[in-house]
Structures are given as structure tokens and as C-alpha cells.
């Protein structure tokens, strides 16, 4: 009877953990997949913006992690960075996906210039008129950018909110814990014509980590102890949080640029609805800050 009783308790505990762990992320895959696995909640807003009057050539030299933070560890010292070092590639992809910009290769400009130099040197070395003519046709003038996008990841705050809950009754129980981090991105548009900073935008994304655990602890008979533990942890990838923050910054930069005349939409009347939604979102965010008591801390009145 005792075995049946404990079996029922174990089954109930397993059922609770399975039902709670359902929405958690499952990391198991059989093979690599094509394309992106993670589509951010901002990506649809970015790609569904009304089209521009014409695409704007822009340059991105470096969009760096400026936090200098290493991965948090409670046991050993880690020399792995907490933030992805590929933010430049993420920004270029976001600019490309928006449909508003023509990103130009500037991060590895030396490689591009070296390859063009090789083509010219080969045509001169062999003194072949046909080869020279072909080289001149291939090597079109490089496109210059009117705007440079600068900025970087300027903040990564860990453990800004932590908490949990647990309960145990006669050796049977479980617990849930969570931790909230935050990543902050700044993006600015710089005029190539005169070096003026045209606009600066900021985007913030929280990173959620959660742990669910359960256990069973009972003496089933004399000197016979039954102990079972199980659990699962879900950590939102920091890279995906950075991607979402960058996409949000690009989305906001497009709208702010339209407002001050940096670039123009194809249909200004259609774009007015986008600006209205954007302004409403900013007002709601400000209200949330004030209601949370953070407005004075950030200097918002």
C-alpha cells in the first residue's frame, strides 16, 4: 500500500512539473536548421513598415559591445563575454530587413579594397587589353553613404529583479525561481556631409531566466530513504535579446527620421498611422515608468 501511495505522489508531482514546464524552451534538435530559429516580437513591426520613397545607402563600421562585462558565474571566473560580439552583423541584417536602407560593407572594408586591387594588378601585369576592359566593367565605383550608423550596446544589468516561490509538505514539494536582466542599446545617425548627429534612439530589452524544480523525500521503511529530484531551467538567450533591442532601435530610427525629414516614405498619409501608433506606444511606456516609481530615477517628469 505504501508503494502505491508513494507512486501516486510521484505521479502527481511529475504531472505538475510537466504541465508547468510545457511552455519552457526545449533545446533539443536533431540537425541544423536553415534561416533564423528565433523571430523577435519586433521583427514583424520592422518589416511591415510602409515602404520608403527610395532606399538610403548607409554605412555601419562598428556596432560594439561597450559594457565590457563577462558572463556571470557564482563558482569560477569566466572570461567569456556576457554580450554577443556580433552586434554589427545583427544591425546590418536589421537594416536590410527593414527595406528602408542599403547597407554598405564597411566593417571589413580593407578586404573589399584588397580584392579590387588584385583585379586591377592582374590586368596590368598581363597587359591584356581584353582583361583590362573586363576589369573596368567589373569594378564599378563604390557607393558612398550619406548616413553612418554608430552606437553600441551600452548596458547589461544583471539581477535587477529576482524572486521565487516554493512549498513542501511531508517531504513532497517544488519551487520556482526567476531572474530578470536588462540590455540597453543606443543607435545614432551621423551625417557624412557635416558630421552632425541627426538623431539618437534608445531601446531596452529584459532577459528572463526561470527555474522550476521539485522533489520527493521520504523514509519508506527503516533505514530506507527514497529521494527524487527533478527540474528544468529556461534562460532567454542574450543574443536574441540584443537582436530584439537592435531591431526596435532601427524601427524607432526610421520613424524618428521621417518625423525630422531625414528620409521620406512613399506615401506620407499611410505613414501617419505608423507615427500615431509609435507616439501612443511611447506614452504608454512613460505611464508604466511613472506607475512603477522609476520616472524620477530616470529624470522623467
Feature annotation, model-predicted:
Residues 154-171:
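Charged, amphipathic alpha-helical segments
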Residues 21-54, 157, 165, 176-301:
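C-terminal/domain-edge helix-coil "capping" segments
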Residues 1-10:
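Bacterial N-terminal signal peptides that target proteins for export
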Residues 57, 61-159, 184-186, 190-200, ...:
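N-terminal segment of the mature soluble domain
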Residues 2, 41-45, 133-135:
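Short alpha-helical segments and helix-capping/turn motifs at coil-helix boundaries
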Residues 17-19:
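C-terminal motif of bacterial Sec signal peptides marking the signal peptidase cleavage site
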